[in-house]
Amino acid sequence: QKVLDIGCGWGSLAIDIAKSANCEVTGITLSQNQFNYCQKKAKELNLENQLNFKLMDYRELDEKFDRIVSVGMFEHVGRKFYRKFFSQVEKLLKDDGVSLIHTIGSVNPPRDPHPWITKYIFPGGYTPSLSEVTTPIEKAGLIVADIEVLRLHYSHTLRHWKENCIKNKEKIIQMFDERFFRMWEFYLAGCEMAFKWGDQVVYQFQ
């Protein structure tokens, strides 16, 4: 089978899939650093015959896949491009294909993102409400087979990220500065609480 990982990041999911299944995995990213790292890891692990990393936009792809996954990328698509995103997923999927889209979301009605996060952490980022995602999925001709809602799982993830951030405080300050470190410590702590007590969840659409 052929698997596509949209927004493959540092390649961990694509590598795990290639290791555990007899399939060909294509991972795409817009980051030159991530692309270089993924290429290096595929060679180190002797998985070059199964892994194919590309430095490109998902909208430029033009081939068919049995499975499509995307983890942590949809938050960067932008509301006005949701229809285009799912239309492209529909175009790239084989007739009997399955897609899994994993994204942070909100249990509240649609609203503008927090201005502090937009300015300092994720310019252009957006966490959608459920209603904002299901409609473009349907309009793209895809079928929603399952929606899983995860909340507390991600609060634990954020807690670990925050702890790792604090452990590496001096390294981070050397790479950037103390202001950068304090912003990210504040951001991770706030997001941990938003998942634990607030309106933030993780949606997995199949």
List the model feature ranges, each with a label.
Residues 38-39:
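Conserved SAM-binding loop
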Residues 45-58:
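Conserved SAM-binding strand-loop segment of SAM-dependent methyltransferases
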